[in-house]
């Protein structure tokens, strides 16, 4: 049974130093509450992740020691000590990892997928490198001063206009995507008005590595799965000519398959009534709520368990003989669990 791969986060040592210094040096007040909440959300993300740091162990431990000293030597009050100890105890801390400028296609195609790079300074070269590989580059100032990565809820009104490109405009860049919706290919109109616009909104305009796209749905007839495969790839080649896409379709025929969700390396989207919302005239055929979470950044533990269960369930009931191609290669899946 397939599982979603554990999220790996790469972090510059200078980011860690600045991140914990900012928390220590910010006077606690009513005005600081919003910043505190953002700091805590990212701290919880690091706490639950597999963290890769670009320095050796001795250098990392030296800044941990500085943090403990600030709290009068009491390790129970040092958030950095707690973080590093937890990750070390669980085998989820790696040092001497590549810097952002050193990432390459081989690394991003392996099991050691890094989805986020936390950097101390927002410089064009870092963003450019991240964009080339579909990696979300998050500078420290963005973590603490913007809401771009926070959890959002969008209310969709029946018969009102709906544009997927606008709704997903701020989605962080990615190199892998899973779309799970049993009904999104029910008709040609659903494919044209919903599936393809969603794909266009979430696939970058260019990448140095292949983009991995997995569609888990109910294909109207088994004979149509190859036709659907060819039509989706043909559309992507026209709309995103600078991106090579590895597409796979899993035909989930069971009536038990009902959950609808989209997952990328950093984004989780859930929609109560499904993603086949938009009519030909641009209006929504249902009233519903779309929940958008940047996984790992502002991710409640219960929700993470929920979406993992969605995808595991979908794979357990998929008719693998009707999957096209048959082998699952998406970076988001843990190959050791398949």
Which positions does each model-derived feature cover?
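PLD/PLD-like phosphodiesterase catalytic module centered on the HKD motif
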Residues: 1-157, 196-338
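Amphipathic alpha-helical interface elements
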Residues: 159-160, 165-170, 174-192, 200-204, ...
